[in-house]
């Protein structure tokens, strides 16, 4: 009977394996036949075609065609008969006497399928714990056993405490007592819990016996060092509780000598040490020192701020005084100390003479200061931007130069920024040599569009050297070694483009001109098309979004040399009859602040030459 049941189970298992979908791995639901003659669920194959246009069979990896997939009547009937067979098999199991003895709530616990939905409690956020008819056997967790105490301590009886007799004791007995401690140490190191020693065992330990044994081996160490060698943690313990030990043993702390604390130290120069004279208190009051007499000869310096000068006078007089008593100590001052003190006193004198109290100032002086402050606030502050340093060898020197200039001149009248913006007034070309630059940068173009003053690097150096913000007239950029493919007429002049931009205060270079700058035409690895749009807008140009139904007059469609749309540039030029130029025409026009001829910048010729 068991063999028949086993064969039936194997046959049903093979049938179930053959009727399983290769995508969802469950029994077919509405099966269809694919072009590779494999069968899948209709919902599974439709979901695959919705996610991908090109679907491969998960079994043979061949490309499937959705239109060629068709229904299979035979497979559909086979699946239905299989489901009926499983339903009948379930009913037969329910009718068997073996399962009738089980309560209905535990009849299908092995399959984890509820007999009735009402058994699951409602409004419960989690599933009930499974209750099996045959419970699992409890499994014990493996835990490390507690280490057993050493057998030597268990077998050896406690010995009474005897007075120490180091001379008569045999070293063999000491070794027998040391061995259990070494064994205990090894057991404690391998155990997982701290080993606890009883109080009786601690009483039986003779520390002097161990100390004497250590001193016999090495006579250089004393008893305290031997104790620390025997118990290393004792050193830190005694150090932390040194005060309590002194109280327990009634040891008085050492007294501090108060004589050095009461001694006064006066500083004097080497010349004063030669003429040093010890005076009494009465003599010091009758004859004041020489520095006080010198200060008393010029009282007019301290008329305005008497309180401040009294304080500074006292501090200034205390240093050169050489009056000393029996407890005084005279220390020779370092060279130049007296000179530094005189300089400090001179600085205090200048500060007090230049600043007076409001009560002593005249209304005219107050009004002059207010006018000066209003004049400073009314002026436009200088906002300085420095170009990037492209030379690695000069980068460190340039950064130090910028740091010195920043810390020296940062104020309300002089500010700094990282990029050129609407508040920028000056651009410093860090790669300049004298009043000439080798190439033009993006910051240079932004400075021309913002009508900024462009100066060379030497301006920073001279400002730091003199300590003043010098005029920019002698440090402006007047030439550039890089050339453009267009010759500028002599009638226009040879001045730089930033000078033309500043002379045209209210005008715009591209006023009344329209530009079509599309991303697909202006892709450039060295220059972002968004920066190009921003430069054109700052120069007064109008940016268009499409180029249909537009007048070709003053219309420019911009391409990049790196663009591959050469055919489209030809079609646009033939269709709309407008100027189709490269972005270099825009950049060179801004750098020279002129509307340059477009013939050398034709996009058709430039793109073709680059691709060739």
UniProtKB/Swiss-Prot annotation:
One of its GO terms (cellular component) is BRCA1-BARD1 complex. E3 ubiquitin-protein ligase activity of CeBCD complexes occurs at DNA damage sites. Following DNA damage, E3 ubiquitin-protein ligase activity is reduced by caffeine treatment (inhibitor of ATM and ATK kinase activity). Its EC number is 2.3.2.27. Phosphorylation of CeBCD complexes is required for E3 ubiquitin-protein ligase activity. Keywords: Cell cycle, Chromosome, Cytoplasm, DNA damage, DNA repair, Metal-binding, Nucleus, Repeat, Transferase, Zinc, Zinc-finger. It catalyses: S-ubiquitinyl-[E2 ubiquitin-conjugating enzyme]-L-cysteine + [acceptor protein]-L-lysine = [E2 ubiquitin-conjugating enzyme]-L-cysteine + N(6)-ubiquitinyl-[acceptor protein]-L-lysine. One of its GO terms (biological process) is embryo development ending in birth or egg hatching. It is found in: Nucleus; Chromosome; Cytoplasm. PANTHER family: BREAST CANCER TYPE 1 SUSCEPTIBILITY PROTEIN (PTHR13763:SF0), BREAST CANCER TYPE 1 SUSCEPTIBILITY PROTEIN BRCA1 (PTHR13763). Heterodimer (via RING-type zinc finger) with brd-1 to form the core CeBCD complex. Brc-1-brd-1 heterodimer-containing CeBCD complexes bound to chromatin are activated as an E3-ubiquitin ligase in response to DNA damage. The heterodimer interacts with the recombinase rad-51 following ionizing irradiation; the interaction is direct. The heterodimer interacts the E2-ubiquitin-conjugating enzyme let-70 following ionizing irradiation. The heterodimer interacts with the pro-crossover proteins msh-5 and syp-3. This is Breast cancer type 1 susceptibility protein homolog. The gene is brc-1.
């Amino acid at each position: 009977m068991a063999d028949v049941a086993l064969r039936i189970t194997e046959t049903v298992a093979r049938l179930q394996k053959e009727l399983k979908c290769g995508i969802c791995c469950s029994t077919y639901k509405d099966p269809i036949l694919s072009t590779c003659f494999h069968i899948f669920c209709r919902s599974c194959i439709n979901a695959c075609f919705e996610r991908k246009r090109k679907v491969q069979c998960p079994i043979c990896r061949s490309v499937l065609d959705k239109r060629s997939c068709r229904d299979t009547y035979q497979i559909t009937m086979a699946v239905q008969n299989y489901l009926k067979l499983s339903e009948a098999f379930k009913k037969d199991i329910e009718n068997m006497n073996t399962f009738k003895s089980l309560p209905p709530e535990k009849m299908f616990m092995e399959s984890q399928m509820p007999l009735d939905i009402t058994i699951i409690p409602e409004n419960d956020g989690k599933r009930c714990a499974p209750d099996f008819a045959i419970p699992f056997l409890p499994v014990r967790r493996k835990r490390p056993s507690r280490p057993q105490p050493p057998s030597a301590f268990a077998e050896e009886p406690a010995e009474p405490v005897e007075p120490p007799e180091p001379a008569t004791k045999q070293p063999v007995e000491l070794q027998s007592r040391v061995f259990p401690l070494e064994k205990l140490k090894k057991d404690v190191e391998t155990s997982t819990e701290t080993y606890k020693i009883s109080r009786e065992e601690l009483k039986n330990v003779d520390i002097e016996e161990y100390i004497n044994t250590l001193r016999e081996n090495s006579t250089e160490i004393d008893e305290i060092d031997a104790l620390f060698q025997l118990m290393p943690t004792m050193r830190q313990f005694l150090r932390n509780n040194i005060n309590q030990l002194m109280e327990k043993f009634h040891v008085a702390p050492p007294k501090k000598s108060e004589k050095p604390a009461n001694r006064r130290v006066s500083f004097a120069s080497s010349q004063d040490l030669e003429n040093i004279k010890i005076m009494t208190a009465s003599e010091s009051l009758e004859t004041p020192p020489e520095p006080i007499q010198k200060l008393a000869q010029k009282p007019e310096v301290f008329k305005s701020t008497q309180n401040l000068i009294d304080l500074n006078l006292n501090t200034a007089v205390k240093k050169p005084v050489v009056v000393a008593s029996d407890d005084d100590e005279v220390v020779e001052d370092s060279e130049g100390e007296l000179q530094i003190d005189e300089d400090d006193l001179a600085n205090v004198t200048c500060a007090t003479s230049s600043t007076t109290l409001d009560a002593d100032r005249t209304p005219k002086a107050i009004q002059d200061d207010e006018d000066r402050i209003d004049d400073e606030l009314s002026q436009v502050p200088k906002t300085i931007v420095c170009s990037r340093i492209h030379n690695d060898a000069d980068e460190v020197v340039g950064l130090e130069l910028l740091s010195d200039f920043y810390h020296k001149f940062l104020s309300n009248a002089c500010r700094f920024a990282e990029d050129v913006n609407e508040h920028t007034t000056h651009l410093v070309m860090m790669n300049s040599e004298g009043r000439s630059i080798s190439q033009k940068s993006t910051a240079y173009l932004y400075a021309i569009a913002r009508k900024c003053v462009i100066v060379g690097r030497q301006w920073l150096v001279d400002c730091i050297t003199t300590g003043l913000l010098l005029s920019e007239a002698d440090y402006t950029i007047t030439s550039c070694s890089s050339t453009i493919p267009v010759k500028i007429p002599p009638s226009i002049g040879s001045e730089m483009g930033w000078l033309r931009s500043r002379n045209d205060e209210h005008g715009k270079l591209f006023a009344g001109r329209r530009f079509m700058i599309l991303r697909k035409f202006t892709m450039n690895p060295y220059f972002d098309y968004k920066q190009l749009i921003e430069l054109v807008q700052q120069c007064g140009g109008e940016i268009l979004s499409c180029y249909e139904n537009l007048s070709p007059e003053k219309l420019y469609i911009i391409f990049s040399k790196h663009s591959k749309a050469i055919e489209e540039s030809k079609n646009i030029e033939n269709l709309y009859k407008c100027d189709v130029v490269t972005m270099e025409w825009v950049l060179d026009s801004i750098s020279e602040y002129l509307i340059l001829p477009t013939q050398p910048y034709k996009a058709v010729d430039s793109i073709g030459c680059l691709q060739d």
